[in-house]
Amino acid sequence: MHLLLWLLLLARLCRPEFICEVSKVTSQVEVNCDNKGLKALPPGLPGDTAILHLAENPLGAFSTALLGPLTRLAQLHLRQSQLTQLQVDGMLPRLETLDVSHNRLKSLPSLGRALPALTTLDASFNELVALSPGTLDGLSHLHELYLRGNKLKTLPPRLLAPTAQLRKLNLADNRLTELPPGFLEGLGELDTLYLQGNWLRTVPKGFFGDLLLPFTFLHGNPWSCDCEILYLARWLRDNSNNVYLWKEGVEAKATTPNVDSVRCVNWKNVPVHTYQGKDCPSPMDGGDMDYDNYDDEDEKLPGVEAPATRAVVSFSTHTKAHTTHWGLLYPTFAYPDHQMAYLSSTLELTEKQTMFPSTLGPIMPTTTPEPTTPPTTLEPTTTPTTPEPTTPPTTLEPTTTPITPEPTMPPTTLEPTTTPITPEPTTPSTTPTTPQPATTPTTPQPATTPTTPQPATTPTTPQPTTTPTIPELPTPPTTPEPTMPPTTLEPTTTPTSPTTTLILSESNTFLGIPELTSPCTTSEYPIVPSLVHLPEAHEVARGTSDSSRNHRLFNPDLCCLLPLGFYILGLLWLLFASVVLILLLTWAQHVKPQALAMATYTTHLELQWGKQVTVPWAWLLFLQGSFPTFRSSLFLWVRANSYVGPLMAGRRPSALSLGRGQDLLGTVGVRYSSHSL
């Protein structure tokens, strides 16, 4: 018997004891082997282990293949385990958290194939110098990545591309000197970014993209305030409530914003968001700031006018089917220093037009030249019409010429006259040309017979010594109805068909212009062929201008009288309503209440009031019978209306209405709730 006991005791001593603590938390088995001096994975781990702690053990190296039997393992903690090598040659399909912080790892293997469900990776405070581009491949469910306290100097540009669901990124306390462009691209759910304690001097333009980033830590970097920092300075101004100062042991949500913590190292230690970069090129000077567009796209930029569209119409007055050339409606932004225009490939000539802010521009036979330059003639259009060689025309329709109004006349409707142009016959040896400025010379059409140059489409050029230049009208010119008398030509000449250039303005939208009547900037627009009929265009323009001038509603006197009339009618109506209300109140005060009241009926209800009995409270404890009954008598006056007049003669208020009865009824109601009245 004693021998058997000794054998059992010896067998127990030979069997190794399981030194880890096993507990169950929220239906998950948790095994705690922290600080047990383990150099290898302890045997006898429960197969349903979900949380395994192996921190503060001198493991040296670790392989996930040892955890193959633990199919339910969700968390693995290897903090401060003196790891120098981590192998992921065994697949853990349910592992969500891997903590290898405070070790001696110099590189990280590719984790996506062995740990497809990983959501949190903590590799802080190791000796990582660089990361391979495929380190995070396959970690599509990764939410938190902690790489703080390493020796990283650069990062692969596409390192975070596989982690589209990343929410927290900690790169603090490294040796990063630059960040790759597009590093945060595709991280739409990123809300916390730690970049403090690095060697960053600037960030690439467009680095933050359109991310919201509610919690950002950028302090502790030697930010160099020069022209390259303007992007970060503007981003800090636009997101001043999202920049925080990190404190040890304090959650990001528990801290307060501190945008002043991001400071320049070379500019008197001022906050970066206050740096304006006065000597740096601005977008208006051709510099590319590449700012993120946080505002609306239609926001007005300084010094930029709103886009406008114009159309140039060119048609022939010689043929019945008029050919029209419409300009491409390209929007143009006019800057203070220069102008930009989008030209068509078929464009042969452009003319600087003066745009007026009118919703429907009238059809003008010509454009008003600028006051500083002499009147010029237009160059020929891309599709000039040629005269018919078989039948020489007998008459030539001249071009219309608007006459400059007299200085004493107000800028009202002008009735211009027409100046017939009679081409003079020329000899074959000479070819006359129309005098034009040196900037826009006109080439006459060559012909074997004596020809005449094309008449200009602008107003006829007067002699410089007798006629001054035509000044620019202060108001948009309207299209008058020209009268065009025929002109008989010499039989020896063959006139060419003149061309007339009209300008049809489309609906223009001008943003940021204080007065709609002020002229806008000038820009150049191309010409593209189209079709239009000259007589119809003249009739539409003339009818529009005549109807707008002759309509009664557009009379300025009538427009001013209408509000005044409505104002007077409102005062009269208010006065009438006040008088009616005063009369009603006066009549109501003089009417006697007795006249309005109906007949009064009085009904007497008498209730017998029993004898009042006083019973001490002590007796009630021993009283086995029923409680005494109390009765009250009330006098009710029933009337046809709610009006209660004075008491009639011979009646006085009873004691019940003076307070005693009210106290009595209240006492009865409280003490004896079964009593009813």
From Swiss-Prot:
What is one GO biological process annotated to this record? cell adhesion
Domain LRRNT, residue spans: 17-47
Taken from the record, one Pfam family name reads: LRR_8
Q: Where is the signal peptide?
A: 1-16
Name its cellular compartments: Membrane
Q: Name one GO cellular component term.
A: plasma membrane
Q: Indicate, by first and last residue, each region the UniProt record lists as having compositional bias (Low complexity).
A: 362-385, 393-403, 411-421, 427-470, 486-499
Q: Report the protein name in the record.
A: Platelet glycoprotein Ib alpha chain
Q: Which organism is it from?
A: Canis lupus familiaris (Dog)
